[in-house]
Amino acid sequence: MVWANAKMRLALSLVTVFFGISLANLEVGFYSNTCPQAESIVKRVVSGAALSDPNLPAILLRLHFHDCFVEGCDGSILVNNGAISEKNAFGHEGVRGFEIVEAVKAELEAACPGVVSCSDIVALAARDAISLANGPAYEVPTGRRDGRVSNMSLAKDMPEVSDSIEILKAKFMQKGLNAKDLVLLSAAHTIGTTACFFMSKRLYDFLPGGQPDPTINPTFLPELTTQCPQNGDINVRLPIDRFSERLFDKQILQNIKDGFAVLQTDAGLYEDVTTRQVVDSYLGMLNPFFGPTFESDFVKAIVKMGKIGVKTGFKGEIRRVCSAFN
């Protein structure tokens, strides 16, 4: 029995080492005794900020994803430590929402000094943002601690819009996420916008001779080129979900199937057998009557993502200000 327990501990350790998924003591309601108002404070600040910025749900959801994919979900993307700051990495281009996290942190420090981590604020804010976009409500396991490292060189393996589906699957697998998780987390693009900067190659240099990506629906191509003309303003933004950019739903998956994906990486989900099957599984007439719904599976995927490389116990710290190490 002792030998069996030892083997089990070794197996769990290997899962953590190779995949970065922490099996440590995150738990729903972690702050119920030490700061019982923590989650309500996060929700109130996020809801108030969203009144003046309808894009905030997408902004905070993206911030959570980018935080977790570098050094785990430890708030490392929030730190300002000069030119080497992780947030300055090209892979984090356009990531925003830092001031919202700081606003939440300031209120939490006033109510419960030194208790709630910045990394938990990011995860909770993303949850509340999704709810504001009419997405699923879910419980967030908390208890993360903040990392003590923030360096742009560590963000070199962030998923990029030009990545092939094979590269994307490999990058997600490195984080302990499978092909199904890839589809579900990519479907977070159901809310938000992207810049024409990320569209140039797909529209004007995808094939020899300056031809566009052939997977773009021919009826959609003129719309994209009008919004993002060749040699035009690369900072112009367009919705990633053509029909419901501010509503969290599975329309993005239908768009991917029909050739209306805006991003190359989203379109690639329908070019791979495994990910195509996942996309189709949420679009059949029998879904959601038979099998899990897109919303329920998305919750599982984002909670799973929120456990990547977390620091708990005596690891890391609880920052007093999210933009600076203690």
From Swiss-Prot:
Heme b binds at H189. CDD domains: secretory_peroxidase (cd00693). The record marks R62 as: Transition state stabilizer. Its main location: secreted. Glycans are attached at N151. InterPro entries: Haem_peroxidase (IPR002016), Haem_peroxidase_sf (IPR010255), Peroxidase_pln (IPR000823), Peroxidases_heam-ligand_BS (IPR019793), Secretory_peroxidase (IPR033905). GO terms for cellular component: extracellular region. The keyword Isomerase does not apply. It comes from the Eukaryota. It holds the Pfam family peroxidase. It catalyses: 2 a phenolic donor + H2O2 = 2 a phenolic radical donor + 2 H2O. Ca(2+) 2 binds at T190, D241, S244, D249. GO terms for molecular function: heme binding; lactoperoxidase activity; metal ion binding. Substrate binds at P159. Removal of H(2)O(2), oxidation of toxic reductants, biosynthesis and degradation of lignin, suberization, auxin catabolism, response to environmental stresses such as wounding, pathogen attack and oxidative stress. These functions might be dependent on each isozyme/isoform in each plant tissue. There are 73 peroxidase genes in A.thaliana. This is Peroxidase 43. It comes from Arabidopsis thaliana. The gene is PER43.
